[in-house]
Amino acid sequence: MIETYSQPSPRSVATGPPVSMKIFMYLLTVFLITQMIGSALFAVYLHRRLDKIEDERNLHEDFVFMKTIQRCNKGEGSLSLLNCEEIRSRFEDLVKDIMQNKEVKKKEKNFEMHKGDQEPQIAAHVISEASSKTTSVLQWAPKGYYTLSNNLVTLENGKQLAVKRQGFYYIYTQVTFCSNRETLSQAPFIASLCLKSPSGSERILLRAANTHSSSKPCGQQSIHLGGVFELQSGASVFVNVTDPSQVSHGTGFTSFGLLKL
């Protein structure tokens, strides 16, 4: 028996897309990307061009408006009297608004300059503290009728008003005391307005005295001191009395203050 052998046919090998297809896809991709970039650039150009055209149109309208005003003033052209009056009214309103805005800006600028050059107001007013009956230097309450305009004047240790700017100050004090209270001596009641310099030295600026009274009940009397003095930066002022136990500390009786001139 003769056996026949047939050789199997070779398997077909899968092949990729042809080279021409790859080139086509590559070119198509490049074309699409280029078109997108070109469209974006054209949109930017068109937007800027439209803005420029809008500005030119506004300038042209302004130019036409000004030419129309000139024609109205000269009586030229075919514009009626009513149209000219309306145009003049619009122009006057425009000029009025411009002048008002200019005047407002000028006032604001002058106000800022004046505000920058203006000296800060320095003032203080304090009332006595009842706990100061045992010390000759009167103490002042940090509450109640207590006024300090800014940080350029401070109340130090409850006793002294210290200033941080050199200048002329009006300094004043009122001390109310009981004139017939029993005392060990009949020496007059003395109140002194004193200055403490930045170096620490002290001196009396003003002084007043009042004699005791024999009337009963207690007869209250007041001593007023006040004057203008030049103070250095860092100087302080305080009030000293000979007998603090006689001082009246009711509201408005005893006070102390200063004002920069």
From Swiss-Prot:
It is a single-pass type II membrane protein. InterPro entries: CD40L, TNF_CS, TNF_dom, Tumour_necrosis_fac-like_dom. The record marks 112-113 as: Cleavage. CDD domains: TNF. This is CD40 ligand. PROSITE patterns: THD_1 (PS00251), THD_2 (PS50049). Belongs to the tumor necrosis factor family. Residues 1-22 are cytoplasmic. It is found in: Cell membrane; Cell surface. Residues 47-261 are extracellular. SMART domains: TNF. It comes from the Eukaryota. One of its GO terms (cellular component) is extracellular space. Glycans are attached at residue 240. One of its GO terms (molecular function) is cytokine activity. Its main location: membrane. Residues 122-261 form the THD domain. SUPFAM superfamilies: TNF-like (SSF49842). Pfam families: TNF (PF00229). The chain crosses the membrane at residues 23-46. Disulfide bonds join 178-218.
